[in-house]
A protein has these predicted regions:
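Basic, amphipathic N-terminal segments
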Residues: 1-41, 47, 51, 55-394, ...
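Glycine-rich, phosphate-binding/catalytic loops in enzymes
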Residues: 279, 448-450, 475-478
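Lipolytic serine-hydrolase domain surface
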Residues: 359-394, 454-457, 463-586
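Helix-loop module immediately N-terminal to the HCX5R catalytic loop
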Residues: 387-427
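Short helix-terminating capping/connector loops at secondary-structure junctions
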Residues: 420-426, 451-454, 502-503
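Gly/Ala-rich beta-loop-alpha elbow adjacent to hydrolase catalytic centers
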Residues: 432-442
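Active-site signature of alpha/beta-hydrolase-fold catalytic machinery across serine-
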Residues: 443-447
Length: 586
């Protein structure tokens, strides 16, 4: 993939407005708010009433707001791709009126419903609940089917040749799987909420999945609620299958790393004197780290099992079998168990989050998950939490431009707001990123102007560029874009060289541990440390632990897996070499 000097980039991370989407986020958030309030007002407006005119007014007002919100989403004002190419485009509309109109309609409807809704209409079925639930589920199903068809068409029409190790998760079917899991999780939340409220005011029962015995306190809830509550039970045997597959793969990999040609002893010069216990521990760590490459299949097993459970219960409800009455007691037990599993899972997650305050290791793990979840700009979903990279990338870009002395030509003028302006002695910059930072660092490089690129080098540690992001988001991280990133770092020319191209020595090193379960190689698996010190490969290896031989106290060196890179000697070696190249050619 060639590197261009204009603003028409194929790589979206190079778009000038990729990390500047505050305007689009504001517009989308207002439209989301207006549409949500309109739907809620419609639900209230369809309740039984003795005042038909009130219903007409409420439904008309809510429909107008909903149509406006949906129509506005089709305009370029909320088009994120348009914003990426027009970073400085003025904002004429923020659609705040749509959000305010939706809130006003909802508040007016909710307050007036106290007098307008027919209080004498007693029913054991919540009005409009079943129809609304089925309508939402039908829309979600249609969207899922459309997404599956789209993926199938793309796979059969434009399936590109991908480099080894860059194949998308599940062969490109990850997007439908994630969407399916979102529907299932939303349905489980719906089930827990509806059943919890029903138990407060009576005894819940399905319409076609009746309880063991109906009484005056029986409250009928949609059968879909029971389907989501019971369907989650099938995830338990699926989890057992996943655990078995993980254990089998772990044993196979551990044996392979102990006996094959690419075994542990081949990576350590002193391996002949090393105890078998140390070799076994390293082989175990390598095997654990390799399991990450199978996580997509395992998640798919759980998701499909959950889907089968929900679908089976829903089919039984649609068939309206008379035998369902006989198993009313069993259904009650299954529903209680399913809701209990979901509530227990939520309690465990809350407990894990609380324990992270006292456990640094868990805090790093949860922090890594949070960083991954908040990497993408909020324009991908306007109600998402604040994006860390959206704040970090522009600031780091400005700092790098300032440190290299190129800020007078930078459109942001990063030093213009500083009074007095700082005295900066231009110098080369080595950008180092660890874990999630090793993904943010390439995003920074992609945003740098050409003159600055000539004075920049990149060092990535524990980088998930290929292993996670490249396989999950090939439209943003792919082998071609990794090549483009490498070319960006080698194609820049320094002012002092009179425009001559810098020697293609490479200014990017990606340090890899085989014990790392998150980071991995990008272009090719690295050679054993020592073999690659004299090469110019981007992917280079670091030994973890640094030695197989016991220390002075007889203890084996600890294995750090994904963490504690600060005490690893290999990054220092490669950082020194990158700095040497920068100072030599700039």
């Amino acid at each position: 993939m060639s590197v261009t000097n204009d603003d028409d980039h194929d790589w979206k991370l190079r778009k000038p407005g990729f990390w500047h989407g505050a305007t689009v986020v504001t517009r989308q958030r207002n439209l989301h708010t207006g549409a949500a309030c309109a739907v809620a007002a419609l639900s209230v407006g369809l309740l039984p009433t003795q005042h038909p005119m009130w219903r007409v007014v409420v439904v008309s007002a809510a429909t107008i707001v909903l149509v406006l919100a949906i129509t506005a989403t089709a305009t370029s004002a909320v088009d994120r791709d348009h914003q990426m190419d027009n970073r400085s485009s003025p904002s004429r509309y923020d659609f705040r009126a749509v959000a305010l109109a939706g809130v006003l309609v909802l508040l007016t409807t909710a307050l007036s419903s106290y007098w307008m809704v027919d209080q004498t209409a007693q029913s054991s079925v919540a009005p409009t609940l079943a129809s609304t639930t089925r309508a939402i589920l039908a829309i979600q199903t249609i969207l899922l089917i459309g997404l599956v068809i789209t993926v199938w068409v793309l796979r059969n029409s434009t399936e590109p040749q991908r480099a080894a190790g860059w194949q998308p998760f599940l062969g490109g079917w990850l997007a439908p799987l994630v969407s399916l899991l979102a529907v299932l999780l939303g349905g489980l939340l719906l089930a827990a909420t509806n059943l919890g409220v029903a138990r407060l005011f009576g005894y819940p029962s399905g319409v076609h999945l009746p309880a063991e015995r109906s009484t005056s306190e029986t409250l009928f809830v949609p059968d879909e609620v029971f389907a989501f509550a019971i369907g989650v039970i099938l995830t338990l045997p699926a989890l057992l299958i996943v655990a078995f597959l993980l254990w089998r793969d772990y044993l196979h990999k551990r044996h392979q790393f102990t006996t094959s040609d690419d075994h542990v002893r081949a990576w350590y010069g002193e391996s002949q004197e090393a105890p078998a216990e140390a070799v076994g521990q390293v082989a175990k760590a390598w095997a654990i780290a390799s399991l990450t490459d199978r996580v997509d299949v395992l998640v798919a097993i759980v998701g499909l099992a959950w889907t089968l459970g929900v679908t089976a219960v829903e089919i039984i409800a649609l068939l309206d079998l008379p035998q369902a009455v006989t198993f009313g007691g069993v259904l009650d037990v299954l529903v209680t168990f399913g809701v209990g599993v979901s509530v227990l899972t939520a309690i465990v997650l809350v407990g894990v989050l609380r324990s992270t305050y006292a456990n640094p290791g868990r805090r790093r793990g949860v922090g890594a998950l949070w960083d991954v979840a908040t990497f993408w700009p909020r324009a991908t979903h306007p109600l998402a939490p604040p994006c860390y990279a959206e704040q970090a990338v522009p600031e780091i870009v400005d700092r790098v431009v300032l440190l290299t002395g190129e800020w007078p030509d930078h459109p942001n003028q990063p030093a213009a707001e500083l009074q007095p302006q700082p005295t900066v002695y231009p110098s080369p910059v080595l950008i180092t990123g660890y874990s999630q930072g090793s993904v943010i660092a390439p995003a920074v490089v992609a945003q740098l102007p050409p003159r600055t690129l000539a004075r920049v080098a990149l060092l990535t540690l524990a980088c998930p560029f290929r292993r996670l992001y490249g396989r999950a988001f090939p439209a943003y991280f792919s082998h071609d874009y990794a090549v483009e990133l490498d070319e960006l770092l080698m194609k820049g020319s320094s002012p002092e060289s009179g425009g001559e191209q810098v020697a293609r020595l490479g200014r990017w090193k990606n340090v890899v541990r085989r014990t790392d379960y998150i980071g991995s190689w990008i272009f090719s698996p690295p050679c054993a440390p020592g073999e690659d010190l004299l090469t110019d490969a981007i992917d280079v290896a670091s030994l973890d632990p640094p030695s197989l031989c016991p220390g002075p106290g007889g203890d084996l060196a600890p294995i750090h897996y994904h963490s504690d890179w600060w005490q690893d000697p290999f990054p220092r070696i490669y950082a020194g070499r990158l700095i040497e190249r920068l100072t030599k050619h700039t």
